[in-house]
Regions:
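A Lys-centered signature of the CheY-like receiver
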Residues: 224
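Active-site-proximal loop/helix segments of hydrolase catalytic cores
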Residues: 145-216, 227-234, 238
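Short, structured coil segments at secondary-structure junctions
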Residues: 89, 216-217
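Bacterial N-terminal signal peptides
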Residues: 8-18
Length: 276
């Protein structure tokens, strides 16, 4: 079963201007918020039976892995560690290598694109990807990562992966260890849905991660990389300062349509209380 949500309120001309070719890179945000996020009622936010041909289905697989299914049947898995999610194998997998739970050295044969988020070839200083398969375009923005063997940084050791589908821009922060620069934000462009690690330790402190959310200004946040209700409760408390709504669905999947994005910043805990 898939959790389907629909927003009755129209987003207005500003969001109409954001529309572009489905496979184009995400344009910059045209709506800028001040401190926090503009207040908008979620009255009318409900789970509906109507389907859109532009729906994108995002399913929480576990830990930092999400399965993304496009209208044309392309399937991607984020932070792929060898677990194929639900059903058939993916067409595209993206990986980061902060820990073994975020990648595999032995991906299943037949995956069309296997994209590492770190330099993995001799002489390579950063991973750079830009691939398109049917209605999904995927590229990455390299960021630094801590060297767990010491106090130094692994330059370009992590990647934020962006998935452009059906005029939606979805970003997965990977194992992010620092705030973003203007250059990072320019490369990211407009992000509608943001997958965010909220462990508060292995990646970065939770207040700092909330700062990153403020930098990116998504419409929807999907928490990941947490273990138990306590971390979610703390994250919910911090996000309250941004006047965000918090939704606890009873399923692992959410159906997202660009034209039905909420006006107000919304956190959807598709990983449930356990996360993983």
């Amino acid at each position: 079963m898939t959790l389907r949500f629909s927003i009755l309120a129209l987003l207005g001309a500003a969001f109409a201007l954001l529309a572009g070719p489905a496979l184009a890179r995400c344009s910059q945000n045209l709506v800028q918020f001040g401190a926090g996020v503009q207040v908008a009622s979620l009255e009318g936010f409900h789970f509906a039976a109507d389907l859109s041909p532009n729906r994108v289905i995002v399913t929480f697989v576990g830990h930092s892995s999400f399965q993304i299914d496009t209208p044309q049947g392309v399937r991607a898995i984020t932070d792929y560690n060898g677990v194929n999610g639900f059903g058939r194998k993916p067409d595209i997998v993206t990986m980061n290598n902060a820990h073994s739970t975020h990648f595999t050295d032995d991906p299943e044969e037949g995956i069309t694109y296997v994209l590492n988020g770190w330099p993995s070839k001799p002489g390579e200083t950063e991973a750079k990807h830009d691939v398109t398969l049917k209605d999904m375009k995927v590229w990455n923005v390299p960021t630094n990562a801590r060297d767990w063997g010491g106090n130094s940084a692994r330059i370009n050791g992590n990647s934020i992966f962006i998935y452009a589908i059906a005029d939606l821009c979805i970003a997965h922060l990977g194992h992010l260890h620092h705030r973003l620069t203007k250059e990072h934000l320019d490369e990211l462009g407009r992000i509608d849905v943001l997958m965010v690690p909220i462990d508060g330790a292995y990646t970065m402190g939770m207040p700092l991660m909330v700062d990153v959310i403020k930098q990116i200004q998504p419409k929807v946040v999907l928490p990941m990389h947490y273990w138990g209700r306590g971390q979610l409760d703390r994250f919910e408390g911090l996000m309250a300062a941004l006047d965000a709504d918090f939704i606890w669905p009873d399923r692992r999947s959410v159906e997202i349509v660009k034209e039905q994005l909420p006006e107000k910043l919304t956190v959807i805990a598709v990983g449930g209380e356990g996360g993983g």
